[in-house]
Amino acid sequence: MIDLLGLDLDGTLLSRTRQINDPTKQALANLIQKKPSLKVMILTGRSLFSTLKYVQELNELCKKPLVEYFCCYGGAKLYQLNNNQPQEQYKFLIDSRQVKTVFEIVEQHKGLFLAYLDKPKAPYIILGANQFYAWLIKQFWYKQRCEYFKNDHLTDGILKINVYFACPLRLKKVYQIIKRQFQDTLNVVNFSKHLIEITHKDGNKGYAIEAIAKKQGLSLKRMAVIGDSLNDRSMFEKVQYSFAMSKSPDELKLLATEIGTKTNRFRFSSLVDLITEKIIN
């Protein structure tokens, strides 16, 4: 009943230690054994650089090109893997004027502005607005992968913006401001009580999975997805079968055809087992 399985990474495929754990490997192996022709697509908010290693790990695990297509930056960029090299299929950049306006709003409210540049090598992340947070992130997290925001970065193109606030109330206020101002041109997702994720209006996971359906001649009614956060909503709305992780927001659970019940190391593998047992044929 399904030809393609779309998977989110963080909070879904990956364990809390950001690994593909043994129960997950076994569940995926059982799934592929039952339907060898099944394709898997990765859909994540991560950058190309931190996504590619998991794509390659899945393909090595199955000893075949299980994952041919994957999208990064919340759906703003789609890739096809060809001879183990990612080839860009499309991208959606945020208008530079919108980037600057969002930066100014975040700076005014003393939040952290983090944006992903459309660049093939480091530094591909820019930080700004709250100078202390930016310094902290650069020193202890992204290091050489990032640099501080300059107007020159606007010409490189921005794929995705993350906005962070320590105070949930302040984040909620800024979310409402940005959402109201750009509701027709940007995807503005309240990812968590500390994070807002922003992409071009068409730069979302739903658009990506629909694009693959058209490109591969697949039916959305024969696709399933697994996710755990509100940036997965767009792909839940497109496909026939959607599986929400047990700790997903209620808004996502309402869209799901099935909801996970486990919160331990089997939280993802139990959903894959369910697909294997019930809907894979």
UniProtKB/Swiss-Prot annotation:
Transmembrane segments: none annotated. Its EC number is 3.1.3.-. SUPFAM superfamilies: HAD-like. Phosphate binds at L9, T44, G45, K205, N231. Its cofactor is Mg(2+). Keywords: Hydrolase, Magnesium, Metal-binding. It comes from the Bacteria. Mg(2+) binds at D8, D10, D228, S229. Gene3D superfamilies: 3.30.1240.10, HAD superfamily/HAD-like. The active site is at D8. InterPro entries: Cof, HAD-like_sf, HAD-SF_hydro_IIB, HAD_sf. Belongs to the HAD-like hydrolase superfamily. Cof family. This is Putative phosphatase MPN_264. It comes from Mycoplasma pneumoniae (strain ATCC 29342 / M129 / Subtype 1) (Mycoplasmoides pneumoniae). The lineage of its organism: Bacteria, Bacillati, Mycoplasmatota, Mycoplasmoidales, Mycoplasmoidaceae.
